[in-house]
């Protein structure tokens, strides 16, 4: 395992730990999810480039599309919760309320 792969896995692990520690605030959770997606993108790109597997060249692009969709939905949810409740607590996202 090269130093680059170890750094990427460390970034993913730190984002995962951040997600577990700061899960009460929606903004912190979204930032940690973005860090996880970015490290997965870099890891997938490096893996495909090092293995010379040409059929999987679209996988990092597809991962970026899903990350952009996740970010857009997350920011829309953050704006809605902030306007409705005045805070960005995840506890405000109770789906049983109408």
Swiss-Prot record:
One of the entry's Gene Ontology molecular-function terms is: NADH dehydrogenase (ubiquinone) activity
Cellular component terms per the entry's GO annotation: mitochondrial inner membrane; respiratory chain complex I
> This chain belongs to which protein, by name?
NADH-ubiquinone oxidoreductase chain 4L
Q: Which gene encodes it?
A: MT-ND4L
Q: What superkingdom does the record give?
A: Eukaryota
The cellular location(s) given in this protein's UniProt record come to: Mitochondrion inner membrane
The membrane spanning regions, by residue number, are 1-21, 29-49, 61-81
Which UniProt keyword terms apply here? Electron transport, Membrane, Mitochondrion, Mitochondrion inner membrane, NAD, Respiratory chain, Translocase, Transmembrane, Transmembrane helix, Transport, Ubiquinone
User: How is the subunit organization of this protein annotated in UniProt?
Assistant: Core subunit of respiratory chain NADH dehydrogenase (Complex I) which is composed of 45 different subunits.
Catalysed reaction, written as an equation: a ubiquinone + NADH + 5 H(+)(in) = a ubiquinol + NAD(+) + 4 H(+)(out)
Q: So what does this one do?
A: Core subunit of the mitochondrial membrane respiratory chain NADH dehydrogenase (Complex I) which catalyzes electron transfer from NADH through the respiratory chain, using ubiquinone as an electron acceptor. Part of the enzyme membrane arm which is embedded in the lipid bilayer and involved in proton translocation.
Query: Primary place of residence?
Result: mitochondrion
The entry sums up its family as follows:
Belongs to the complex I subunit 4L family.
Organism, by scientific name, is Balaenoptera bonaerensis (Antarctic minke whale)
- Identify the EC number(s): 7.1.1.2
Q: Which GO terms describe its biological process?
A: ATP synthesis coupled electron transport
Give the way it sits in the membrane.
Multi-pass membrane protein
